[in-house]
Structures are given as structure tokens and as C-alpha cells.
Amino acid sequence: QLSVTLGDRHILHDINVSVPVGKITTLIGPNGCGKSTLLRSMIGYIHSPRECVTILGKSLQSYSQNELARQMAFLPQVPNMPKDMTVEELVYCGRYPYQMWWKNTAKEDREIVDYALGITKTNHLRNQLIPSLSGGERQRVWIAMALAQQPKLLVLDEPTTYLDINHQLEIMELLKRLNDEQGLTVLMVLHELTQAV
């Protein structure tokens, strides 16, 4: 059971959530109902007084940062946008949990980055700066970075916010394809019931 208190205010009390492996799980509700707070608590971004979160059968607290990053990738609703970074450089950031300070980028890292750019259809953008991209392109690039982590669990906080309907559909289709083809477990927050269907 998960409970969250922020200051003197009890936000969540005795919540039980199970996310099935290999499925897409969506937390849905109106703005301000606590979806993002629940999501962030479930992945350890907000501290819960009762540490009771497990990921793949292992307590969240028992993971090192690198171990956790190899299991789970998280995309917040509005990621910090680097102004002077290319798409390829950003996607390479997803490889950090696998890199050692004394080693250069390995062939495997390059192959995984190429794969992530390919599956998200962002390969043609690899040399562009992040601020030059449209909203839908940016979101696909952030997902490519998350995929470069090779996570077993992809967690997204309102991945279609601020996108027009075409880009929303594009992102939802990409997530469905990743789940269907790779068995990637996806946990996300949405406030539009129609997107979850």
C-alpha cells in the first residue's frame, strides 16, 4: 500500500496498484486528481513514508541509480529541453547507465541508438538541434532516448500533452507498437479517456 503526504496534506492513502508485465497500463482522470503524484510515487520520484514499491519483484530502494535506469525509463510531462544538443546526442544520453567512465562509446551503444532513432522514425532528425523540432518530433525523440536505455518498463507522464491530434495519435500508435512487437511494459498517465482506448 502506498501513501503520500506533502507537507501536512495527505495526498494519497493506502493505494494498491499492480502493473502487469508486458502490458500497457494507463492511469486516467481529470486534471488535479493525483494521477501524476501517484505515478511519481510509484517510481520513487516522490518519497512515500511507507516504502512498499517493487519493480520486477525487487524493492525500489534496493536498486542503485544505474540498475534502476536499466530497468525503467521515465519521461516527465515536460522534460527539460537542452538548447545546444542534437537529437543524436540526446538519444545517446539513454546509454549512460551502461557506460563506464574509462570507456569510449561502444559499437553496441551506436547500434542501440540507431535502433531507437529508427523505431521512433527520427533518424532523419539526428543532426538537428532539439529546439528546432516540432512538439511531436520532440516527444518521439524523448521516447527514442528512453528506448536507448533498453528499459523493461517505460513510464510516461501525459506523453501527448500540448500535441495536436495527429501527433497524439502518432505517439499512441508508437507506444502500442513497442508493446506489441517488443512486449515493452508501459505505464502512463492520461487525462483523455479516448486516448486510453
Label every model-predicted segment.
Residues I28-P30:
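The feature captures the beta-strand-to-loop junction immediately N-terminal to the Walker
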Residues I43:
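Helix-to-loop junction immediately C-terminal to a conserved catalytic motif
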Residues E51-S59, L68:
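Conserved ABC transporter NBD signature motif
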Residues Y92, K107-L125:
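Conserved ABC ATPase "signature" region
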Residues N104, L129-L133, E137:
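Conserved ABC ATPase signature
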Residues Q150:
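Conserved catalytic motifs of ABC-family nucleotide-binding domains
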Residues L154-E158:
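Catalytic Walker B motif of ABC-type/P-loop ATPase nucleotide-binding domains
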